[in-house]
Amino acid sequence: MILSLASLLLTQAAAAQTSPAQPAAPPSCTGPEHAALDFWVGDWDVYPNGKDNLVAHSKIEKLYNGCAIRENWMPLRGNGGGSLSGFDPATGRWHQTWIGSAPGVVGFEGGPADGKMVLTGWWAGSGPNGEDGLTRMTYSRVEGGAVRQHGEFSADHGVTWQPSFDFIYRPHDSAGD
């Protein structure tokens, strides 16, 4: 009896060792809250709204198991930069961190509103006269598969807003490369 019990225990121990534990799957970022900014993903030619003079190229990628969106902003003139955006399930908010080739880091926070993505953050020196204040960016789909990024500035903590930039992201024309 003791011999059969020992044999049974050894057999179970051996079976447990031959079946390696499967690593836990990473958390999924496939829900609709993680897809709220997916319309911005793509290779883009960027123009001032209402004009046809190309000012930048921008590559927007969905990365890290669908949990992040990375922007690479490549202006034809001036400083480039990029951002990393993602949804935080703990807060229910979207966050974007912008880092440019000029010193400084800007953090934005917000979320979807009326089919658009609205992100707001404190941006030192971003005012029309170089003053510090809030910048609110609104991303929206527009006709022709394009995306509008409309920026507004507030020097009074969001009481009033004035336009600061307005870009249209059109799908990149690879024929012109």
Locations of the language-model features?
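Bacterial N-terminal signal peptides
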Residues: M1-Q12
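Hydrophobic small-molecule pocket/channel-lining residues, especially in calycin-type beta-barrels
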Residues: A16-D177
